[in-house]
């Protein structure tokens, strides 16, 4: 869970930070249109919470979170297509709506499911007769989040250098804007894909979660 959380937060940080540069220089979007694209993305991140909760209850948290990551990968690949077709896309915000819906909904799974999966791991420890160490687990998630944000800043700096970005110029070269757009789309897709792959190591399904909770109730009842 920690590795998946790191990779997915890295992708999210790339989209939110490098994305503003790409929207401005690659597509020529103004601040109002950028706000619309990003606003729709956040809206679907919020609206997706109930569907993700329903899917996790039916198929398990790992399945739901992996589905969210795959949606984000699809959003990143669609973004790459927009970059390649940027001359046709222009600065129309409507062309970005599928990206906003896919990426926003996918990132929505990141908001709650990893935390719930860590809580299930804490229950597993207690059910096995161990101690509850919530502080250790959630502290590790906090570290993973901060590490991913710091790593994103380093990667963005490298991407800008590799693409030949010059902040003193009002307009960047065609090769530069193409490279920045593809680095963002492909980089985010690869990172979300890696997050989905490492989730394969998480073995708690909903049946195991319910069994652990029943075991905990029995242990606590016996100690009273």
Regions flagged by a language model, labelled:
Residues 1-224:
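Membrane-embedded alpha-helical bundles of multi-pass transporters/translocases
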